[in-house]
C-alpha cells in the first residue's frame, strides 16, 4: 500500500493474482474470483441470492464481535464496509470484467501501514487501464446462465405423512386434505440470467484511457427473486511536463435494483406445510387469504379489525403457505453508488528522486427499500403493511505524502512520509404501518414504526515507511502509522501501529551464481501491529439520549409521541490491538515452471471488544460493550504453481494452496460469567443460542450436551452423559464441542491448453468445520404434539421419523442441544469446469484483422463431496437455518475483441 514494489522485493506476506479468464468460472461479483485462489483466505459466498456477497476471512478472525472483514482498497480508495439496503455486496460497485488484479496483504508487516483498518488483512483491487500510444480496442463479454437447484430437502409426501399421522395415537386425521403437494417444487424454479459488458480502451500520446459499461440481469432459483445491476467505469491516466506530473483518475457508478424473496421464510414454509393440502383454495375462506390455503382460526372478539364481516384470520402458530409468502410479500430495493479517486504524482524537476504524491477519493451510496405485505397476507392479515427504508452514506478520504528513492552504489533506499484524513457519514430513515380497510387509518398508533438517525466518524492518520536494500540481497522494511479516531474518549483516541520486516534473496548470493535453474529463493521475517475500531458506535464513549422505538410511545390526548431514553455507553473503550509474527519462504525455478510459497504465522489480539452482562444500575440496560480479553491465531500456509507439461501445442498448469489455522481465546473477562453467548439463534427454544466464547476454546464454539447412543449407534432420546456425576442432567453438564471455523482450507485449479482449446477445473475444500443441523432439530419431534400443535399440522422428514424422538422440550430443552445435531461439515466442492475455444481474427478491415475472441461453456457447482446430511455444508455462521440454496449453473459465454 501507498506505493508500488516489485514482487521479488516484497518483505511481507503478500499474494498478487490476476483473474484467470480460462478458469474464473461464473463471476457475478468480485469476491467470486477469490474462491480457493489464495492460501489462508477463506471465501464463503452468502448463499444463492442474486447479487449476494461473501464472507471473506484472512487467516481466521482477529475479533469476537467487531468486524472480521478485510479492508478493501479499490484503485487507491479505501472502502467503508457498511452496506446499504439493497446492496448486500460491498464489491458490487465493480464489474468483474474490469478487474486487472488482486493483491492480498496478509501479515501485519505488510498491513500495518493501513493502521486501525487492517487487523483482518487488506485486499487491494486494481482495475484495468489503457496504455500510452495504444490503439483503440473495443471488447465485449457476454454470457447466458441457466441455474437450477442442486438438492432438495427430504420431507414426507402426502402418503407418507398420512401413514405417520395414522400411526400416532391422539391424532385425528380427518382434517387432512386429499392433495399431494410438493411445496419445494412450488417455490423453486429453473432461472435464466444474462450478463453483458463492453469496454473501450486506448491511449493517446499522454492520455491512456479505458471506459466500460456492464449490465447483469440475474434471476434467482427461488421464485420472485431477481437483481438488475448496471456498472459504468472510467479510468484516465494523463501525464504532463515530460511525464513528471502524472494522474490516475478512476470513476465508477453502480445502479442496482432488487426483488428479494423471503427465501428463509418460504423455505421453512415449504418444509413445514402439510403436504395433503393444495396451494390454492376457493370458497368463502379464500377472501381472508387471497385464494391461498392457510390454516385459519376465528377472529378474536377483541380484534381491532373494523370490518365485522372479516370473520377469520391465519393461525399465527401454523406454518405459512410459502407460495403466498413469495407472492403477497414484496420487498424491493434500489441503490446507487458513486465512487471516484484522483491520484497525483509529481516528480520534482531537477530532483527526480523526490516525488510528491496526493490523492482525494470519495464514495456516495444511497438506497431505498420498500416492504409491502398484502391485506390477505399471513403476517399482516387484513391491515397489510407498507414500509419504506432509506439509507445514505458518503465517505471522503484524502492523503498526501513525500517519497524519496535513490540508489547509492550497493544501497537502495526508499523513504515516504505523509498524512491522511478520512470522514464517514451515514444516515437513514424508516417508517411503516398497516391500514384498516374500512376506516383507512393505522391499525394501532403504537404499531406505527418510524425512525430517523444520522451518525459520522473521522480518522486522522500520520504514516511513514522505509525500504532499504543492500546488494540486491538484503532487504529491510520499517513502517509506522498513528491513527486518531473520533470514536474514543479523550486520552484514548490515538493508536500506534509499527511494523518491521527482513528478507534475504538467497538466490542473489555469490555462492548461488552457478545454480542457474533457481529463479528465486527468498526468506522473509516480519512483525507488526494493527488495530480495530469497527463494531463500536460512533458516540458510544459518551452518554446520550436517543429516541425510543414505536412500542415506547406515550399518548397525549389522541396523539402518540415518541419518548427519549438514555443510551448505553462506555467511556473507557479503547482499540483492539493485533500483533502478528510471520516467517516465509518464496521459491521459483525452471523459468517459472515450478514455484511455491510457504508461510508460518502467529498473531494475538488484545483488548477484544464484546458485549457482556453488567450489574444492574451501572449503565442503562444490562449489557455493555467492553474490552474484555485476548485471542490468538496461528497457522501454516503453502501454495504451489506447477507447469508439469509445456510443449508447442500442449500445456498443463496446476495451482494448489492449503492453509491450516487454529484460533483460541486466551483471556476473557465476561462480567459475572466466564463465557459470552454468541451466534445466531436456532429455530427451537425461542431465541436459544448454542454458541459460546470461553477461555481455552475456539471462537463461537458450540455449547451442547453429550449424546448417549445405543449399541447400533442410534441416539437415545433424553439420554446424555452426566459429565459432573451429580446424578442429574442440567446446564452444568454442557460442554464445548467443535466450532464453525475450518481447521484446513484448500484450493486447486488445473488447466489444460491444446492449441486453441482450453479445459479447466477449480476446486475448493474445507476440513474440520462443524455445522448445527437446524433443519433436523426443528423437526425431530415425532409425536402428537410435534405434528399437530396449536391447531396446526406440521410436516416432518424421514430422518426424523427414523430418529423417533417424541419430545424436544420435555427434558428441559436439552434434546435440541444434543451434540448429535452438531455435524462434521467438511467438504470438497468443484467450483467450476470450463471448456473454451479461442479463435483468431474473423474479418479484415483496412488490412487490419478484427474480431478475435473466445467462446466457452462453464458448469458451476457441478458436485460436492461431503458427509454432512444437510442441503449445503458451506454455512458461514455454523447454524444451518433455511439458507437460500446455491444453485448449479450452466453458462455459455463469448469474449470478443473488435
What are these regions (language model features)?
Residues 1-255, 262, 310-312, 339, ...:
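Short, small/polar-rich motifs associated with maturation and membrane association
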Residues 21-22, 69, 162-163, 169, ...:
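Extracellular/periplasmic, surface-exposed regions of secreted and cell-surface proteins
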Residues 72, 468, 708, 723, ...:
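Short aromatic-centered micro-motifs
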Residues 139-177, 263, 270, 626, ...:
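Conserved small-residue
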Residues 171-174, 184, 317, 323, ...:
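Extracytoplasmic gating/loop element in the C-terminal half of outer-membrane beta-barrel translocons
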Residues 739-772:
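Glycine-rich, aromatic-lined ligand/substrate-binding cores of catalytic
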Amino acid at each position: 500500500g501507498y506505493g508500488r514494489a516489485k514482487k521479488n522485493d516484497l518483505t511481507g506476506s503478500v499474494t498478487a493474482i490476476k483473474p484467470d479468464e480460462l478458469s474464473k468460472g461464473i463471476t457475478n461479483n468480485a469476491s467470486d474470483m477469490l474462491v480457493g485462489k489464495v492460501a489462508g483466505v477463506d471465501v464463503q459466498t452468502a448463499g444463492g441470492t442474486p447479487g449476494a456477497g461473501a464472507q471473506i476471512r484472512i487467516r481466521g478472525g482477529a475479533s469476537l464481535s467487531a468486524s472480521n472483514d478485510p479492508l478493501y482498497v479499490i484503485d487507491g480508495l479505501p472502502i467503508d464496509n457498511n452496506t446499504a439496503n439493497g446492496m448486500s455486496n460491498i464489491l458490487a460497485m465493480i464489474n468483474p470484467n474490469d478487474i486487472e488484479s488482486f493483491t492480498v496483504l496478509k501479515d501485519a508487516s505488510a498491513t500495518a501501514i493501513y493502521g486501525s483498518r487492517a487487523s483482518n488483512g487488506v485486499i487491494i483491487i486494481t482495475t484495468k487501464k489503457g496504455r500510452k500510444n495504444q490503439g483503440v480496442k473495443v471488447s465485449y463479454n457476454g454470457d447466458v446462465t441457466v441455474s437450477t437447484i442442486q438438492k432438495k430437502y427430504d420431507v414426507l409426501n402426502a402418503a407418507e405423512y398420512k401413514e405417520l399421522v395414522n400411526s400416532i395415537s391422539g391424532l385425528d386425521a380427518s382434517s387432512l386434505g386429499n392433495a399431494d403437494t410438493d411445496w419445494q417444487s412450488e417455490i423453486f424454479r429453473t432461472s435464466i440470467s444474462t450478463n453483458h459488458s463492453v469496454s473501450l480502451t486506448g491511449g493517446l500520446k499522454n492520455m491512456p484511457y479505458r471506459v466500460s459499461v456492464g449490465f447483469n440481469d440475474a434471476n434467482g432459483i427461488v421464485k420472485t427473486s431477481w437483481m438488475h445491476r448496471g456498472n459504468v467505469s472510467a479510468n484516465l491516466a494523463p501525464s504532463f511536463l515530460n511525464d513528471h506530473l502524472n494522474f490516475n483518475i478512476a470513476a465508477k457508478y453502480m445502479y442496482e435494483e432488487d426483488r428479494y424473496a423471503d427465501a428463509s421464510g418460504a423455505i421453512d414454509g415449504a418444509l413445514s406445510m402439510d403436504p395433503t393440502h393444495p396451494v390454492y383454495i376457493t370458497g368463502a375462506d379464500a377472501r381472508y387469504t387471497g385464494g391461498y390455503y392457510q390454516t385459519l382460526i376465528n377472529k378474536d372478539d377483541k380484534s381491532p379489525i373494523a370490518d365485522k364481516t372479516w370473520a377469520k384470520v391465519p393461525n399465527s402458530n401454523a406454518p405459512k403457505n410459502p407460495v403466498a409468502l413469495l407472492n403477497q410479500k414484496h420487498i424491493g430495493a434500489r441503490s446507487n453508488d458513486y465512487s471516484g479517486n484522483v491520484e497525483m504524482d509529481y516528480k520534482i524537476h531537477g530532483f527526480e528522486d523526490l516525488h510528491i504524491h496526493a490523492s482525494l477519493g470519495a464514495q456516495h451510496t444511497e438506497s431505498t427499500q420498500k416492504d409491502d405485505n398484502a391485506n390477505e397476507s399471513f403476517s399482516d392479515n387484513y391491515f397489510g403493511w407498507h414500509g419504506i427504508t432509506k439509507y445514505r452514506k458518503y465517505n471522503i478520504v484524502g492523503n498526501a505524502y513525500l517519497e524519496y528513492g535513490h540508489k547509492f552504489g550497493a544501497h537502495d533506499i526508499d523513504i515516504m512520509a505523509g498524512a491522511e484524513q478520512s470522514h464517514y457519514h451515514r444516515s437513514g430513515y424508516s417508517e411503516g404501518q398497516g391500514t384498516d380497510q374500512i376506516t383507512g387509518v393505522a391499525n394501532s398508533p403504537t404499531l406505527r414504526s418510524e425512525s430517523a438517525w444520522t451518525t459520522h466518524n473521522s480518522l486522522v492518520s500520520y504514516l511513514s515507511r522505509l525500504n532499504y536494500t543492500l546488494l540486491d540481497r538484503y532487504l529491510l522494511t520499517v513502517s509506522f502509522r498513528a491513527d486518531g479516531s473520533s470514536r474514543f474518549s479523550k486520552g484514548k483516541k490515538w493508536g500506534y501501529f509499527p511494523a518491521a520486516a527482513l528478507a534475504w534473496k538467497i538466490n542473489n548470493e555469490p555462492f548461488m551464481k552457478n545454480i542457474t535453474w533457481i529463479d528465486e529463493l527468498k526468506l522473509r521475517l516480519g512483525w507488526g501491529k494493527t488495530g480495530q475500531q469497527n463494531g463500536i458506535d460512533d458516540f458510544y464513549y459518551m452518554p446520550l439520549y436517543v429516541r425510543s422505538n414505536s412500542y415506547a410511545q406515550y399518548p397525549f390526548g389522541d396523539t402518540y409521541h415518541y419518548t427519549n431514553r438514555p443510551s448505553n455507553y462506555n467511556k473507557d473503550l479503547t482499540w483492539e490491538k493485533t500483533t502478528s509474527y510471520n516467517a516465509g519462504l518464496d521459491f521459483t525455478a525452471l523459468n517459472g515452471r515450478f514455484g511455491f510459497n510457504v508461510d508460518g504465522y502467529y498473531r494475538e489480539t488484545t483488548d477484544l471488544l464484546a458485549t457482556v452482562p453488567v450489574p444492574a444500575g451501572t449503565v442503562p440496560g444490562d449489557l455493555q460493550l467492553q474490552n474484555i480479553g485476548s485471542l490468538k491465531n496461528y497457522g501454516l500456509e503453502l501454495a504451489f504453481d506447477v507447469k508439469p507439461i509445456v510443449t508447442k501445442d500442449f500445456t498443463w498448469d496446476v495451482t494448489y494452496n492449503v492453509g491450516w489455522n487454529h484460533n483460541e481465546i486466551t483471556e476473557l473477562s465476561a462480567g459475572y460469567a466466564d463465557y459470552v453467548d454468541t451466534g445466531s439463534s436456532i429455530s427451537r427454544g425461542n431465541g436459544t443460542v448454542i454458541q459460546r466464547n470461553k477461555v481455552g476454546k475456539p471462537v463461537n464454539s458450540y455449547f451442547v450436551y453429550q449424546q448417549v447412543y445405543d449399541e447400533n449407534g442410534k441416539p437415545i432420546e433424553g439420554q446424555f452423559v452426566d459429565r459432573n456425576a451429580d446424578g442429574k442432567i442440567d446446564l452444568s453438564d454442557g460442554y464445548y464441542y467443535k466450532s464453525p471455523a475450518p481447521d484446513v482450507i484448500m484450493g486447486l485449479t488445473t488447466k489444460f491448453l491444446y492449441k486453441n482449446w482450453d479445459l479447466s477445473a477449480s476446486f475448493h475444500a474445507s476440513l474440520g468445520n462443524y455445522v448445527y443441523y437446524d433443519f433436523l432439530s426443528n423437526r425431530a419431534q415425532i409425536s402428537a404434539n410435534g405434528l399437530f400443535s396449536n391447531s396446526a399440522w406440521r410436516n416432518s422428514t424421514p430422518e426424523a421419523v427414523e430418529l423417533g424422538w417424541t419430545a424436544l422440550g420435555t427434558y428441559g430443552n436439552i434434546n435440541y442441544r444434543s451434540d448429535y445435531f452438531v455435524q462434521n461439515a467438511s467438504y470438497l466442492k468443484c467450483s467450476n469446469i470450463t471448456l473454451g475455444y479461442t479463435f483468431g481474427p474473423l474479418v479484415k478491415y483496412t488490412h487490419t484483422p478484427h474480431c478475435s475472441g473466445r467462446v466457452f461453456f462453464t458448469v458451476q457447482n457441478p458436485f460436492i463431496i461431503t458427509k454432512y446430511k444437510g442441503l449445503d455444508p458451506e454455512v458461514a455462521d455454523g447454524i444451518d437455518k433455511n439458507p437460500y440454496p446455491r444453485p448449479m449453473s450452466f453458462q455459455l459465454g463469448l469474449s470478443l475483441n473488435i
